[in-house]
Amino acid sequence: MALTQRLEFRQSQSLVMTPQLMQAIKLLQLSNLDLTTFVEEELERNPLLERANDEASGGEAPAEAGQFSDSDGGHNDEPGGGPGEAFEPGQEEWMSKDLGTRAEIEQTLDTGLDNVFSEEPAEAAARNAQDAAPTTYTEWGGGASGDEDYNLEAFVAAEVTLGDHLAEQLSVAFTAPAQRMIGQYLIDLVDEAGYLPPDLGQAAERLGASQQEVEDVLAVLQKFDPPGVCARNLSECLAIQLRELDRYDPAMQALVEHLDLLAKRDIAGLRKVCGVDDEDIADMIGEIRRLNPKPGMKFGAARLQTMVPDVYVRPGPDGGWHVELNSDTLPRVLVNQTYYSELSKKIGKDGDKSYFTDALQNATWLVRALDQRARTILKVATEIVRQQDGFFTHGVAHLRPLNLKAVADAIQMHESTVSRVTANKYMATNRGTFELKYFFTASIASADGGEAHSAEAVRHHIKQLIDSEAPAAILSDDTIVERLRASGIDIARRTVAKYREAMRIPSSVQRRRDKQSALGNVLSTAMSDRSRNPEPA
C-alpha cells in the first residue's frame, strides 16, 4: 500500500464557547449584589467604561485633562483654576521659559504637577478646612452618592468577633510559643456558634504535635469566656457550662449524656437513667434549658447581606399585574466614545492601539450584555406571573405546578437559560418576597382526574390540617391522606410523611405527647393558682 500526500477541503460547523459568551452566561446567574461587584471590577479594569450618572460622561473628563497639551504651549487661559482665572504678571512667561509645558514636565516626572508642587501653607490649610467640612448628610455618613440615606453605621464601633475575643485570652493563658501556636490554630477552627470540629486528630498531625498536647491546650481553651466555647458537640458544651456553675453532678451528667431522650420528651426514660424523681428531673430540665447551646453567637460575625428583590409585582389598574425591574439593582454603564476617539488620534504604538480596541469591544459587549440580562429577567418574571396568577390573587393554595420547560417554551428560550435567570433572583409581591425558583414546583395528580396540584400547595394544605387538629384528635398520616383525597388530591402516605418531615412537623405520636404535656402543664398551673387563691365561701 503506497503512502501519498493530498489536500482535502472540508466544511464543518461546531459550537465555539467564546470568552464573551461564557461571561454572558455567567452574568445571567449572578445575583444583583454579585453583579454590582463584577461591574465595579470592570469599571476599574476598563478605561473606556464609565457610570451612566457620572458628570464627566461623554469624554468630558479626558478633555479637561488634555487642556494642557503641546499645542497649547502652556498658554491656556484656564491652567488649573476655575473659568476666568489668569496668570499673575510674568508668571505665564516663567512657566513657558523655565519649566516648559505641563505635559513635558509630567512626562519627565512620571506624575502630575499637582502631586509635586504643593500649595502655599495658608492656602492649603484653608482648602483642607473647607474640604473637610461635610455639607450634606451623605458626607457625614460616609455615603458614596447624594441619593443614599444617612449612614448611621459609620459611627458604630466595629463588633468584636469571637476569634478576637478568644485570641485576647490566649495571649494571657499561655506563655510557651508551642502552646500558643496550638491554641491559635484551634481558635481558627472555631465556627460562629463556638464549636470545634469533632475530630482534632488532623489538627495534631498538621501541627506536628501529639494528641495529648492538643487535648491539654483544648482543656484550657474550654475555660475561656464565653462558657461553653470550644466544645466539640452539644453535650460537651452543656457540660462545660454546668461545671462553670458547679452543677455537673452524676445525675446531671447522665442527663447531658442522654439528650436524645430529652429531644423525644421521654421523661420516664430520663428519670430512669438519672435516678431521680419527677420533681428533680423537671428542675434539671429547666437548668438545661437556661444554658446557651450556641455561646459564640453573641459575638460579631460576618454581616448578612440584605435580600434585595430584582423584580417588583404590583396590582395593575385594570385588574392584572404590573411587573417591573428594580432599577436600583441594575448597574448603569456607558462606553466613553469621545475618550476613545481622542485617544485614537494620539496613540502611535500598535500595542496601545490593540489594547484600546479590545477595551472598546469589551465595554460595548458589557453594555449590551447587561441590557440583554435585564430584558431576559423581565421576560421570565412576566411569564411566571402569568402562569401563577392564582397564587398572586388567592394565595399559596392556588399555586400551580410549573417547571422550567413550560416557561422556556412560552417565551421561546432554552430551558437552561431560564434556569440561570431564576437562580439567585427574588421577586417582591403583595404576599412577600420569594425566590424565582419558589414558583417552580412538582405536580401531584388530582384524585378526580382534574387539574394537577402544586407540591407547595399540598404542603400548605397539610400544614393547615395539622395546625387545626384538636389535642384529643391528632391526625395520623393515614388520616391526612384520606382528607387530602377527599379534597381531590391523590397522594401517597409516604409523600405526606416526606412533606411533613420537610416542614419539621413531628409525627402524630410526638404531637399527641407534646400537646398532652402542654395541657397537663396548663392544668397544673391552674390548680396551683387556685390553691393559692381559694374562692371565698
Swiss-Prot record:
Keywords: DNA-binding, DNA-directed RNA polymerase, Nitrogen fixation, Nucleotidyltransferase, Sigma factor, Transcription, Transcription regulation, Transferase. A motif (RPON box) lies at residues 492-500. Residues 403-422 bind DNA. Induction: Negatively autoregulated. Residues 52-90, 507-537 are annotated as: Disordered. Residues 518-528 have a biased composition (Polar residues). Disulfide bonds: none annotated. One of its GO terms (molecular function) is DNA-binding transcription activator activity. It comes from the Bacteria. Coiled coil: none annotated. Residues 55-66 have a biased composition (Low complexity). NCBIfam families: PRK05932.1-3 (NF004596), PRK12469.1 (NF009118), rpoN_sigma (TIGR02395). Belongs to the sigma-54 factor family. This is RNA polymerase sigma-54 factor 2. It comes from Bradyrhizobium diazoefficiens (strain JCM 10833 / BCRC 13528 / IAM 13628 / NBRC 14792 / USDA 110).
